[in-house]
């Protein structure tokens, strides 16, 4: 009997992306997998259809839109009470956590598992992630310090090649297997014992920064976050953020503030936190206004094109 690898995906009306996720999964590993859909209240019927189509898919409704990290935590916590689809045991100590808009590259999961055997202190391993246009997304980064992270957050949208953003995103480094500060939570191979040791994802983060926070806490507990570019996936990430960019931007800034404020606590640092909060609020206002202007221009061009 072969051990089964659990794959946890959080769904919220994922649309056609889920089919690509599941169809490509068979190419990613020769090992049997069981997909656990932590559903945060989908209304498009896609997760239910996937359960009917794929015998190795199970639907685990969370009861509400709990956010990414909370849904993952609850699902991983249930693994001890479940087994594979035919009663097989789980792969010892490993679980895949991924967004449902990931499309798996051939052999990508096997490459992550192979790397795990080379890094006995790896708490999380992440693949090379490509955007839909084929470019490499900077998914393996340094831990954001107050200066580096703050300057990236404030200046990045308006000056993408500023030195703080460039250092933080590590875009000038050639892809190589190495420990990094943190890995994108859109696709991770996670050591369950390490994940449990640090308490899983911090559930204060509804979305964004929960992966940065996890990488930080894993590192402080003596675990490594390892980038494995021999494993490749494609991430169709615009499907969720495109629905309501203003609210997603606000959520990102809230999570950024939580992360940095946690690491700069104390009454004597209150002015620093006030400055950070104000800077993030200003950034949010400017970016939302810019987004609305672009949207109005696009609509105007469409109207003009009809005449």
Swiss-Prot record:
Gene3D superfamilies referenced in this protein's UniProt entry, alphabetically: Spore Coat Polysaccharide Biosynthesis Protein SpsA, Chain A
Phenotype of gene-disrupted mutants: Cells lacking this gene lead to irreversible loss of viability.
Molecular function (Gene Ontology), one example: hexosyltransferase activity
Coiled-coil spans in chain: none
UniProtKB keywords: Glycosyltransferase, Transferase
Reported cofactor(s): Mn(2+); Mg(2+)
Temperature dependence: Optimum temperature is 30 degrees Celsius.
Gene Ontology cellular-component annotations: plasma membrane
Influence of pH: Optimum pH is 8.6.
GO biological process: polysaccharide biosynthetic process
EC number: 2.4.1.289
Reaction equations catalysed: N-acetyl-alpha-D-glucosaminyl-1-diphospho-trans,octa-cis-decaprenol + dTDP-beta-L-rhamnose = alpha-L-rhamnosyl-(1->3)-N-acetyl-alpha-D-glucosaminyl-diphospho-trans,octa-cis-decaprenol + dTDP + H(+)
Extent of the signal sequence: none
Superkingdom per UniProt: Bacteria
Major enzyme class: transferase
Stated role: Involved in the biosynthesis of the mycolylarabinogalactan-peptidoglycan (mAGP) complex, an essential component of the mycobacterial cell wall. Catalyzes the transfer of the rhamnosyl moiety from dTDP-rhamnosyl (dTDP-Rha) onto the decaprenyl-pyrophosphoryl-GlcNAc (C50-PP-GlcNAc), yielding rhamnosyl-decaprenyl-pyrophosphoryl-GlcNAc (Rha-C50-PP-GlcNAc).
Family statement drawn from the similarity comment of this UniProt entry: Belongs to the glycosyltransferase 2 family.
More details: Was identified as a high-confidence drug target.
UniProt xrefs under PANTHER family: RHAMNOSYLTRANSFERASE WBBL (PTHR43179:SF7)
Protein name, per record: N-acetylglucosaminyl-diphospho-decaprenol L-rhamnosyltransferase
Organism: Mycobacterium tuberculosis (strain ATCC 25618 / H37Rv)
Gene (name only): wbbL
């Amino acid at each position: 009997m072969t051990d089964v690898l659990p794959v946890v995906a959080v769904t919220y009306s994922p649309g056609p992306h889920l089919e690509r996720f599941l169809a490509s999964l068979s190419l990613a590993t020769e090992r049997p997998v069981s997909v656990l859909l932590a559903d945060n209240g989908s209304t498009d019927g896609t997760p239910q259809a996937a359960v009917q189509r794929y015998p190795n898919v199970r639907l685990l409704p969370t009861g509400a839109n709990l956010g990414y990290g909370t849904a993952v935590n609850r699902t991983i916590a249930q693994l001890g009470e479940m087994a594979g689809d035919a009663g097989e045991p789980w792969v010892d100590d490993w679980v895949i956590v991924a967004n449902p808009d990931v499309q798996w590259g051939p052999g990508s999961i096997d490459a992550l598992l192979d790397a795990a055997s080379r890094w006995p202190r790896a708490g999380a391993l992440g693949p090379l992630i490509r955007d839909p246009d084929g470019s490499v997304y900077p998914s393996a980064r340094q831990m954001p310090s107050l200066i580096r992270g703050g300057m990236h957050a404030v200046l990045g949208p308006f000056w993408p090649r500023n030195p703080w953003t460039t250092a933080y995103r590590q875009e000038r480094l050639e892809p190589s297997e190495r420990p990094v500060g943190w890995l994108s939570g859109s696709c991770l191979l996670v050591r369950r014992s390490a994940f449990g040791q640090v308490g899983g994802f911090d559930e204060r983060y509804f979305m964004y920064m929960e992966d940065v926070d996890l990488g930080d806490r894993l590192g402080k507990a003596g675990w490594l976050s390892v980038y494995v570019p021999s494993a490749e996936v494609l991430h169709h990430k615009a499907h969720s953020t495109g629905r309501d960019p203003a609210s997603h931007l606000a959520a990102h800034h809230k999570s950024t503030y939580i992360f940095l404020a946690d690491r700069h606590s104390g009454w004597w640092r209150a002015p620093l936190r006030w400055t950070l909060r104000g800077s993030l609020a200003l950034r949010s206002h400017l970016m939302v206004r810019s987004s609305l202007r672009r949207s109005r221009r696009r609509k105007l061009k469409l109207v003009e094109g009809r005449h």
